[in-house]
Amino acid sequence: MATANLLDLNGRREMDKAKALESALAQIERQFGKGSIMKLGANSPVMEIEATSTGSLGLDIALGIGGLPKGRIIEIYGPESSGKTTLTLHVVAEEQKKGGVCAFVDAEHALDPAYAKKLGVNLDELLISQPDTGEQALEIVDTLVRSGAVSLIVVDSVAALTPKSEIEGDMGDMQMGSQARLMSQAMRKLTASIGRSNCMVIFINQIRMKIGVMFGSPETTTGGNALKFYASVRLDIRRTGGIKDRDNVIGNTTKVKVVKNKVAPPFREVEFDIMYGEGISKTGELVDLGVKAGVVEKSGSWYSYGDERIGQGRENAKAFLRANPSVAGDIEDKIRASHGLDFSTGEIGKDDDLVDM
């Protein structure tokens, strides 16, 4: 009898809790609007993370979701001439292919339109701003994000976002922490509207050295710690070597490490070629990733796909794939399938491949 009464009492308590929860949810929705709170179930749009390709198949795989996540803050940093802007322009080109509107906030005043066009960027549809101060740049970003019409914004770079107080002051004036305070305020203001508008904001950043570091890496990024916390993905990009054609250096081998990733496992690394004036080598990645995935066979110096030999040596194999876009498309689809990614939307044509040896 006592057990039955206890169960009945517990049942009433659970019913009271459920009613109290329903009442609280209804009050929140009345006060803040429908959708301000919801259950994170399978039907929730929050569960589906849309991604934009980086232009590098290997990096798309390393990121775990097939590219960089929409509606998030991204940081790409590295030493000078490591490929930061090149990688970002590839992302812009890929987003434009999907019909998205892209904006480039050129705080460094260093964007090369001819180079951007070579990477596949549609200059006629690209919005560009060259602000005078850091406050002006971030206010422009905030306005574009709140419009809901822009799907990708690039800020190049955080180091060039100079606070107004520093510009108006004398050359020798000390402005301690002014840029960090500016970035911290911008992150607090931007983060909610970025999520609502599903707009991706990429911040390109530079590296500085901390003084007096005895243990660990002395490297740090500019603009304080706020960006590190608010960024969903942080990419560390480095140049690891040169690519030569006889005596001429025609490109770089580049390594990218996923330092932070809130949407997939982090700390993955990928290497690819960046050719001078042309961008990321897609056929080079297909050869390397195809061998790793078992799609392309390598025997000695020969590369084979199925029963067909596609070239002796890596450069000859790349040349074969450039000349045979249907084979390149098949290899890419199989590589994507082996990593659980969506198939490519089309074949790699000669115009899409950015390597011309």
From Swiss-Prot:
It comes from the Bacteria. It is found in: Cytoplasm. PANTHER family: MITOCHONDRIAL DNA REPAIR PROTEIN RECA HOMOLOG-RELATED, RECA. This is Protein RecA. The keyword ATP-binding applies. Transmembrane segments: none annotated. SMART domains: AAA. One of its GO terms (molecular function) is ATP-dependent DNA damage sensor activity. Coiled coil: none annotated. Can catalyze the hydrolysis of ATP in the presence of single-stranded DNA, the ATP-dependent uptake of single-stranded DNA by duplex DNA, and the ATP-dependent hybridization of homologous single-stranded DNAs. It interacts with LexA causing its activation and leading to its autocatalytic cleavage. GO terms for cellular component: cytosol. Disulfide bonds: none annotated. It comes from Cereibacter sphaeroides (strain ATCC 17025 / ATH 2.4.3). Belongs to the RecA family. Keywords: ATP-binding, Cytoplasm, DNA damage, DNA recombination, DNA repair, DNA-binding, Nucleotide-binding, SOS response. ATP binds at G78, P79, E80, S81, S82, G83, K84, T85.
